[in-house]
Amino acid sequence: MGSAEDAVKEKLLWNVKKEVKQIMEEAVTRKFVHEDSSHIIALCGAVEACLLHQLRRRAAGFLRSDKMAALFTKVGKTCPVAGEICHKVQELQQQAEGRKPSGVSQEALRRQGSASGKAPALSPQALKHVWVRTALIEKVLDKVVQYLAENCSKYYEKEALLADPVFGPILASLLVGPCALEYTKLKTADHYWTDPSADELVQRHRIRGPPTRQDSPAKRPALGIRKRHSSGSASEDRLAACARECVESLHQNSRTRLLYGKNHVLVQPKEDMEAVPGYLSLHQSAESLTLKWTPNQLMNGTLGDSELEKSVYWDYALVVPFSQVVCIHCHQQKSGGTLVLVSQDGIQRPPLHFPQGGHLLSFLSCLENGLLPRGQLEPPLWTQQGKGKVFPKLRKRSSIRSVDMEEMGTGRATDYVFRIIYPGHRHEHNAGDMIEMQGFGPSLPAWHLEPLCSQGSSCLSCSSSSSPHATPSHCSCIPDRLPLRLLCESMKRQIVSRAFYGWLAHCRHLSTVRTHLSALVHHSVIPPDRPPGASAGLTKDVWSKYQKDKKNYKELELLRQVYYGGIEHEIRKDVWPFLLGHYKFGMSKKEMEQVDAVVAARYQQVLAEWKACEVVVRQREREAHPATRTKFSSGSSIDSHVQRLIHRDSTISNDVFISVDDLEPPEPQDPEDSRPKPEQEAGPGTPGTAVVEQQHSVEFDSPDSGLPSSRNYSVASGIQSSLDEGQSVGFEEEDGGGEEGSSGPGPAAHTLREPQDPSQEKPQAGELEAGEELAAVCAAAYTIELLDTVALNLHRIDKDVQRCDRNYWYFTPPNLERLRDVMCSYVWEHLDVGYVQGMCDLLAPLLVTLDNDQLAYSCFSHLMKRMSQNFPNGGAMDTHFANMRSLIQILDSELFELMHQNGDYTHFYFCYRWFLLDFKRELLYEDVFAVWEVIWAARHISSEHFVLFIALALVEAYREIIRDNNMDFTDIIKFFNERAEHHDAQEILRIARDLVHKVQMLIENK
């Protein structure tokens, strides 16, 4: 029984932890939390469940339905803080009761807010949790909970959560953070969309209909020669905009209020089809009142991705402004009610069939309230005591007023006609007013002016003229027709002038575009269908044929298949070394074995060198900090300088994009001496062995030399000779074990980490003694500057390796050791750059796919030739941002202008992590493989800067969401962080390839 009760308590506490985490994340992202945030409601519900758990009946009140009110009232008698909450809640409840007018829906009232300076009305959810919510906003909820935990015997049973000596204080401690946040009532511009998560925004976008085409309409045409669309494209754009507004209006926002909503309202769009059920809603904005009806198939998302079917149903959707409606016909049947809207031009809208149950009368009641104060129904609905709104009961006045309501005999009327009138306004059908609204001035159009000529006999000369252009000078029609003719001619000149200057600006800009974008893509287009089959990718059969007959397969054809279709997973281990440059296409098996042998020898040599230096680093750490001997991960360092560096580095979170390293290594006097060099020269170089270079040994002069040339391989050769003489048997075993890095933990496990259990203490002590002897022999071989640099880099590597892709099945402790060995080997050869956070993210997929330490080391070295420029010591990131700015400014000018207006995030800093890690953290692991191999193949097929087009494809994939929600810089970072690992990688690649092709065509002007 006790375990079940503990499980309930843990579940309640876990719910509170989850909601606290959500609300703290929102506060960090947006710098504030709105009082109407859904996270506040969820947190209040979770806390209330904890407070009501095993609450005594005496404390809850025997007859009170609101247990929270009873609890706070009782606690308020002895706790001053809770007493203040009681007074505030009573004031809120009195205000809510005092602002309830009859005939106005509560939903509309709640959305209106406070116009009189009083506190805004609370939502039903907020009223439900008003006690906890008020205590939270007043920042005293943690104090109230702490008081309840300390005095639990008065209010709770023994099994209650707050009566638990552990769970009670924990609950109070959890609420300290939310009680320290700032809560606001202001309706900021970004509040209305930031409440929904990224997934909800994407779901709303999918409901609207099929995804917009790539060349979506913008304020100005995109550069390039585009085919003319049919006249139906304009209607498609209007339908898309209507669909977007319809879906957004179904959710509450700052622009409109939802006055009425009813599902399963039937509409028969055509005579030859059945009635379609849908969602009917009535929306009120500051200027207008609009009726909307959306088919249920679109609301439920049951149509899938069929663009044709969605477009058909969007044709059925209704959006009717009531400013265009003059009268409403209502018919009541036993099965329900029917409503027909009649527009100003006499056209009847499709009938709306309401289900039975008074829904038609409810709609008319909300409509009448929405028309106020400017408009009203004629005749108005009647108010009957005890029933509310009812249909009017009118008698026939005369035969002239046949339009008015009348009773059908002595029975109850079933058919009604209501007019919509606006008292105090001029007649709705005044044509001059309509023209003025459209900006054409007060002149009447021709179809309104012609009757003026036909009235009377003053214009007979005009009608008797044989030529339509020959009008007598005394004709009275001239003053009426002349302004219209001048207006049309002026409009024609303006249209032609705008078209000409737009074309001229386009041509002038095109030359500039070619100059800026020509370097981003290859000018020769390699299509996927010549020869066909490239979209299937590089399969196992094609690769086996290439292995058998390499002369008949061209490298470009293989790369084309990889670019358009990817690589079959089974052969990635064999193909990736070719894509990264470890092997060259066309190599024989013997040549590949020679390359592998050279790389393996080089890797083992580097492994031994940095491990020897690591022994010295560890010895110096033990001498400097004996108290922290068993806490290497805390960042123990050699001197105060490195201590400050490590302390600064330890504060960097892995959730940030990159840790910027300000440490500057010593400037070498000779570029050849900036890193350790081998004593022996490598053999004749073979293709693909760029890692191995011929280097000369540098003689070591004195141990006091502070020159960077002391980082040479004559030191390592001295260490190696001491090993050969048997000075450290333990280290020889480590060196030998390093040769089989792919089969188990690397040697670093013995030299870096402290023993995890007492059974390992003795072997570790022996190895430490051997390391001390070795350190005593060769400690003078390294400069203090070098040792400090190595210590700092080892600390950073160890910290990142332990948290690198922890949830992926491959990275068990032995494989993490292998990852560390490869990473340390690379950094040892590039100490001038050092380790920067993010490098492990680039190495991990290579090790997973290749599953070979030496091969991963070589491929990673080739990969870093391109990627190292993205890190702080390189300058490629600024170039990426500038190119992204040019691309989106040219290909999507409307989105670029939006970015420039909303805080000017056209510097594209939100792409930093994308470029730094080649989208590693944005995609699932399997998708990372597919994207990376396309990036590598694209260097030879379409563009050496294909990462730019993938980044642009990510932005374009969510273009409408970004534009519709008017996102600023913070919003777009939050959106893409939430969408990480939820992207459709194949769709992103398809868009990226299309963008490359578009730029190629733009440059060629085809």
Curated annotation (Swiss-Prot):
Keyword Calcium: no
Compositional bias ranges of the Acidic residues kind: 661-671
UniProt biased composition (Polar residues): 707-725
Tissue specificity: Widely expressed.
GO aspect biological process, one term: positive regulation of GTPase activity
Domain description: The Rab-GAP TBC domain possesses GTPase activator activity.
Protein name: Small G protein signaling modulator 2
Source organism phylogeny: Eukaryota, Metazoa, Chordata, Craniata, Vertebrata
